[in-house]
Amino acid sequence: MYFDAIIIGAGFSGLYQLHQCRDQIGLKTLVIEEGKEVGGTWYWNKYPGSRCDTESHIYCYTFSKEIYQNWKWKERYPKQKEILSYLKYVEKKLSLKRDIIFNNRVNSAFYLDEKNLWRVKTNKNKTFYCKYLISAVGSLSTTNVPNIRGLKNFKGGWYHTGRWPNKKISFKNQKVAQIGTGSSGIQIAPVLAKSVKSLTVFQRTPNYSVPARNKKLTKTFIKNTIDKYNHIKNLLKKTPGGHGFHFSKKSIFEFTESKRLKILEKAWLNGGLSFRACFSDTTKKISANKIVSNLSLIHI
């Protein structure tokens, strides 16, 4: 079967690309998705405690003013379920599902020079051809399972945050070992600790974690973000990573010690990723990085 464009993945990028290719350009488009529904990383990563580390009012689509203003986020940092609900809302709003096939994983994509076409095959023995092939698989959906000797014969239950089962799992009064303290590890550990008999965390490299200061969003805040739609949309295009905050242009060494502490304390209390934007050289000079990093020692 021939399509003008085939998109691999139905996460944030894949859904947006489908809308652009099909609705804006008019291409005959197909999305191939391995999962059972839309969501991408937010479909696969459904482990306890899973939530976004970017603020909800900027971790969303801004191409549609109607969608931006009609969807009401509940928290500063949304949970996995809320983000998945948001993507389902967008999919329904734009009628995207009719051009998505689920439960199909792309096994091969080969470019046919003589025909100027891509030949795409899935694990369900389906073959498609297209002129444009767009990869929207992202970087957060591939699992990394350690090659642990004896794992296959382990009689207890073992799980991976990136492929969490759909059913509810109880860890109450159990001995649990956790390997890794990346973003997922940091989020799941405190949730597990509430019910387990014991939790042992195996950590190779400690990561620096800043308080999120998560909270429920007030009606006033929600109204302000809706009213500032155009401003926020333009701001995201001009800030690093599209995070919605500017990095300081001043070095940490341009400030006195007391002034540095005041700036850092304010950012620490505010929480979130903007903490790294206090000074221009936090991630560029080791000496500056140490000063900023040591702030956490005050709060231990």
Which residue stretches match the model-derived regions?
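N-terminal FAD-binding dinucleotide-binding subdomain shared by FAD-dependent oxidases/monooxygenases
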Residues: 1-5, 10-151, 167-168, 181, ...
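Short gly/ser/thr-rich secondary-structure transition/capping motifs
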Residues: 117, 157-163
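Intrinsically disordered, low-complexity serine/threonine-rich segments
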Residues: 161-162, 172, 224, 300
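Catalytic micro-motifs at enzyme active sites that drive phosphoryl/nucleotidyl and oxygen chemistry
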Residues: 163-168, 188-189
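Glycine-rich NAD(P)-binding loop of Rossmann-like domains
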Residues: 168-176
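Rossmann-like NAD(P)H-binding beta-loop-alpha module
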Residues: 176-196
